[in-house]
């Protein structure tokens, strides 16, 4: 029902825009509204708002325009976009992650960017082609990175008699057994099943799912999580919880970085950018664990988009180019978030500890697919696995009930 309401509202706003003009920007063709995601750490010297306001003010001064910046909190991110777009009070330029694209493209809410970039400009972006989604250049990849990796507290492993970071599922379970046997009070593997947002699946579910050989959808866009491979991954997580590897209450944690940084856990999957904020712990990492079929993990592929309601698309495209210039991106990656370059001219300035992620281990990195009802499907799956962790569902029920829900309500 939620999905049907979303589609209906988007239809209404697209129809209304034919008569009402350009929504949030209609007051002036020299005004742009920019919505960005929060990426700076909570204790950062420069906030996201401060950074992008400075960029926007410089652009405005050079182009005789005004750019209004708003940072959208993650906990209300999708709702904010939905409300803004359907009420003609959304941005001219926004930041979408893959789960959000299908419906906005399907209903004509996003502008095709291709005509605003010359061939020379396109060649300056490392991942320009990844922005071609559902037959149009609706995105300009902006954050292609932040892989989810497994961190290991090497001092805890030494106490447990484990001399190397596990690289396979079997090695992980053996190491967890050793931690439980030799390190009282330590959680072997901390997972944030208490986090309210399904984005945690990127760290604590999809790496196992893909490494078991699972596929979220097939080439026709049909949901395929209820497969032998999907069950093997879900059963593996369930078994780890049952063995006590995840602590006494797997749904109590909502941020794995806290217990890991406090030395309370031997292992934790987290974004590479968050890992660099872990101080005071002797940690090493593995990019992905070898499962029954493969070794794969999640990598972000978030993008900048221009909304069709924007009145001055030429100006908006110019702002996007300014935001993604080598100069701006270098400063952004050094000041706000440690990510790999998105342009050919930007040098990698991130931690050498993770330099191999995008070279030697690049074939292990995988993004989420774009398909109908993705966000709602992920939310339903996440809640089902939370119920499994509470003993309310079996692994088989998680996959079957989620698939039935998707096919009945979202497909």
Predicted segments with their positions:
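Short, solvent-exposed loop/beta-turn-alpha elements that line the ligand-binding surface or hinge
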Residues: 111-125, 129, 188-199, 212-232, ...
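Hinge/lid segment of periplasmic solute-binding proteins
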Residues: 98-148, 173, 183, 201, ...
